[in-house]
Amino acid sequence: MYQSLAMAANHGPPPGAYEAGGPGAFMHSAGAASSPVYVPTPRVPSSVLGLSYLQGGGSAAAAGTTSGGSSGAGPSGAGPGTQQGSPGWSQAGAEGAAYTPPPVSPRFSFPGTTGSLAAAAAAAAAREAAAYGSGGGAAGAGLAGREQYGRPGFAGSYSSPYPAYMADVGASWAAAAAASAGPFDSPVLHSLPGRANPGRHPNLDMFDDFSEGRECVNCGAMSTPLWRRDGTGHYLCNACGLYHKMNGINRPLIKPQRRLSASRRVGLSCANCQTTTTTLWRRNAEGEPVCNACGLYMKLHGVPRPLAMRKEGIQTRKRKPKNLNKSKTPAGPAGETLPPSSGASSGNSSNATSSSSSSEEMRPIKTEPGLSSHYGHSSSMSQTFSTVSGHGPSIHPVLSALKLSPQGYASPVTQTSQASSKQDSWNSLVLADSHGDIITA
């Protein structure tokens, strides 16, 4: 019953016998035609069954014989020498008749013992053939009347079998995928040559930024830290884009020229003296530009500045520095201010006497409140005490002798005041003692 298994042990499989597990590899030879093993119909999509490589390209298969067994229709085998012209399947007639491939999938290492296992293996092989696009094989006339394809016609019609076959399958599958767009939409179909327009990878846009040379439409910059776009979609560099965003206008390409100084303003000349250089441009009553000199002259005098006063250069004032150390006048022993020119600067004693007497006359003296009641003339008393303060040791005899009214001793003391020219620091203390003596006497 299982002669094919014994034959498979003696003879090794020829090259290409298990190529992708095609259904033709499980067909028995003529010697095993009476075997009751059933080979099911391969489950190949209808779009693949109508391909050109399944039609023609080999010798006609022999008519299958039907055996009256419980397994159903018997397999039909190919005659000896059917595939002698094929380079991959060519073998001798005796060997081709004797060899019969095992009815199991090459994935299993043990032979099938029942018909159901062989049928399941054949079905799995058929699914693999349909999935990987390597299906097809020899089928008898009893199995839908299909013919066994051969390599001679296939190789003869195409220069390179695999690319042409893949292109044909890819085109047909692309058409089926376009019709259904469901089970055929897989990454494998995207890589087929027959795929019409594969989807664009989203990351390719990122590479376009490096491959495509962008240029700023405003300034023509080729590189920038950040590319921006204006309202119309044109590319702008970072500087031009920020300028347009903040100001609403295009960034100026040429830097604006620096404003000329007022002294050299282009196109201006004084309407009165026709000078072109001035520190300040003014306007007259008519609105015409005039130089600073003519404008000030007209403002101060009310008449135009005479042309004879025009000078080629600009005359500027020599301003005095603001931080000048003011000269401080020397102070006297009691804190009063003395004139800067004292008697020591001149050898004339009369000048020294007159200056000291004038300062003594203007010097006030503190008096107690009781003095004004005893002495009615406070001014004469102040002069008297200021004059007496310069005499020094002779203060006590003079004051003790003059115990009269203020009118009596004012005149002799005033006469002696002309000769007083020296002041001592202790005169104020002596005056206080003598004053106390006068008040208490």
UniProtKB/Swiss-Prot annotation:
- Tell me the segments the record calls region Disordered: 60-107, 313-392
Which sequence ranges does the entry mark as zinc finger (GATA-type)? 216-240, 270-294
Swiss-Prot/TrEMBL keywords: Activator, DNA-binding, Metal-binding, Methylation, Nucleus, Repeat, Transcription, Transcription regulation, Zinc, Zinc-finger
What are the record's GO terms for cellular component? chromatin; nucleoplasm; nucleus
Q: Kindly state a single biological-process term from the GO annotations of this entry.
A: negative regulation of apoptotic signaling pathway
The record's function comment reads:
Transcriptional activator that binds to the consensus sequence 5'-AGATAG-3' and plays a key role in cardiac development. In cooperation with TBX5, it binds to cardiac super-enhancers and promotes cardiomyocyte gene expression, while it down-regulates endocardial and endothelial gene expression. Involved in bone morphogenetic protein (BMP)-mediated induction of cardiac-specific gene expression. Binds to BMP response element (BMPRE) DNA sequences within cardiac activating regions. Acts as a transcriptional activator of ANF in cooperation with NKX2-5. Promotes cardiac myocyte enlargement.
This chain belongs to the protein called Transcription factor GATA-4
Source organism per entry reads Mus musculus
In the UniProt record, what gene is named as encoding this protein? Gata4
